[in-house]
């Protein structure tokens, strides 16, 4: 009774914790990282045979033992033979002898010698492959794991824009002993643009959640396979990753016909090795992994059993280096994010017969940045009602053009408004679709436009004729980015024209017609 009462008294004398202290203790417990544990697994004999079968060595060993069995059978077995001798006046003679006495024993011996040479070559290849493995002791492995845990990840993307070029070459072929030259057509890949980027996760926060690796010293040898991966703690950080990734590939998507996308994760300032064999003591390895044991077993054609035994005595573990993103996520302001302009890729127009025909038959010259800067500033009074007309261009006729043809004009994204306040006058005979870059929305819209003849809205209009041979430029030339991605396209017409009338496009639209 007294023994049971003493603890009760001790409990009664212990002061109760205040609510503030309990909350602090709970917070401290929460802050402590509780990591999961991972241990190497020793596999069974059948599992080790399935993991590393060494089927080449096994097949060669079986064939060599079959040849040895055939030679042994020739030496041990005795059969009854019947022979005729002419010196004995045609009498037959019965005797016992080896079934391979007539030279048949050399057939399995020849096969055995050939297979033995191939077997030794395979053993040398396996030994060289084993020597190339990364070997380390347990302390070095733990240090390497600690460095990978503390390393900062780099989640990268890489995009390669390319197209195929049709080429020809002369090839010499032979037929019935005669040499002749033919022309071979082949397609060669040409890389035109390579871009790289990485995920900006400074607003997400990062934490390593890899498991604790224990009990490596309990096994004489352990094969470790390392894998890098990352995960997200919340939906916001995942959306940030997907948004940056989509923006990067969208920027590169339309630069050429095809795009090769790559992505991955690297650990900065860490020499990452995927496969490592860890020993308790690197200087004193087990006897069965020594060079002498391997080659002695190979000479006696016992290399395959030794390999299975080594695999059986080796433990395996697949260790993941995992980084968790989004623990300290803070929403980034819209102004800090870079502005991406989504352009229509080349392959997106393949389903449109009209746009495809227009792309193949256009006659356009894109001025360079230097040419755009050196253009004269003329007639600034054209732009009334809009202070900054933007980077504009006019259709300049080549030495006379009499009939309307298909043309397109892609202007600056600042030219969505009409400078004169009136409707734009287009020089197209029949306008079906307009693919416009909306100012301020960074989106591409596709809608139907009105269809009319050239006589209704043609260059006979006085306002249109008054704009002839005019080039409206703002005082400040465009930036290099605008000049590159939003050029002024000047359409040159091939056929003659009696009147030198010009039509000014005042919208950043691409007009097409059949």
From Swiss-Prot:
UniProt region (Disordered), positions on chain: 1-40
This protein's record includes keyword Cell inner membrane: no
Membrane-crossing segments per the record: 57-77, 104-124, 286-306
Family to which this protein belongs: Belongs to the TMEM151 family.
Alphabetical keyword list: Membrane, Transmembrane, Transmembrane helix
GO cellular component: membrane
Keyword set includes Glycoprotein: no
One protein family per Pfam: TMEM151
Gene for this chain: tmem151b
Localisation per UniProt entry: Membrane
UniProt-listed InterPro entries: Tmem151
Taxonomic source organism: Xenopus tropicalis (Western clawed frog)
Protein name: Transmembrane protein 151B
Membrane topology: Multi-pass membrane protein
């Amino acid at each position: 009774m007294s023994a049971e009462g003493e603890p009760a008294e001790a409990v009664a004398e212990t002061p109760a914790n205040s609510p503030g202290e309990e909350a602090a203790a709970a917070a401290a417990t929460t802050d402590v990282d509780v990591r999961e544990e991972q241990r190497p697994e020793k596999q069974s004999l059948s599992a080790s045979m399935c993991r590393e079968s060494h089927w080449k060595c096994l097949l060669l060993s079986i064939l060599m033992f079959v040849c040895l069995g055939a030679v042994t059978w020739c030496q041990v077995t005795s059969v009854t033979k019947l022979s005729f001798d002419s010196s004995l006046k045609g009498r037959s003679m019965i005797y016992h002898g080896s079934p391979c006495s007539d030279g048949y024993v050399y057939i399995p011996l020849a096969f055995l010698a050939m297979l033995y040479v191939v077997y030794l070559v395979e053993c040398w290849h396996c030994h060289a492959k084993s020597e190339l493995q990364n070997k380390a002791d347990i302390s070095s492995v733990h240090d390497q794991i600690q460095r990978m845990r503390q390393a900062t990840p780099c989640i990268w993307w890489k995009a390669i824009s390319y197209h195929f070029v049709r080429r020809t070459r002369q090839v010499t072929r032979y037929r019935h002993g005669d040499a002749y030259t033919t022309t071979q057509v082949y397609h060669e890949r040409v890389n035109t643009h390579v871009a790289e980027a990485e995920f900006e996760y400074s607003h997400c926060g990062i934490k390593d959640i890899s498991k604790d690796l224990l009990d490596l010293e309990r096994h004489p040898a352990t094969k470790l396979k390392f894998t890098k991966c990352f995960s997200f703690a919340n939906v916001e950080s995942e959306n940030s990753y997907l948004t940056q990734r989509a923006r990067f590939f969208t920027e590169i998507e339309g630069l050429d016909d095809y795009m090769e996308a790559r992505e991955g994760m690297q650990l900065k300032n860490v020499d990452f090795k995927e496969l490592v064999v860890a020993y308790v003591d690197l200087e004193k390895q087990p006897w069965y992994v020594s060079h002498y044991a391997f080659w002695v077993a190979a000479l006696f054609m016992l290399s395959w059993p030794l390999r299975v035994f080594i695999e059986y005595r080796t433990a395996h573990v697949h260790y993941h280096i995992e980084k968790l993103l989004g623990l300290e996520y803070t929403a980034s302001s819209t102004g800090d994010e870079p502005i991406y302009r989504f352009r229509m890729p080349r392959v997106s127009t393949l389903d449109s017969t009209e746009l495809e025909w227009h792309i193949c038959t256009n006659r356009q010259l894109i001025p360079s940045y230097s040419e755009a800067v050196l253009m004269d500033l003329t007639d600034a009074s054209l732009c009334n009602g809009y202070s900054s007309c933007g980077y504009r261009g006019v259709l300049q006729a080549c030495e006379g053009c009499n009939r309307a043809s298909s043309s397109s004009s892609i202007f600056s994204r600042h030219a969505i408004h009409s400078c004169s306040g009136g409707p734009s006058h287009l020089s197209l005979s029949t306008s079906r679709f307009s693919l416009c870059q909306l100012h301020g929305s960074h989106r591409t819209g596709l809608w139907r436009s009105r269809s009319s003849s050239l006589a209704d809205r043609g260059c006979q209009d006085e306002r249109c004729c008054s704009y002839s041979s005019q080039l409206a430029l703002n005082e400040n030339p465009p930036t290099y980015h605008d000049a590159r991605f939003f050029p002024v396209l000047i359409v040159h017409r091939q056929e003659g024209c009696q009147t030198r009338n010009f039509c000014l496009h005042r919208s950043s639209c691409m007009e097409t017609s059949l």
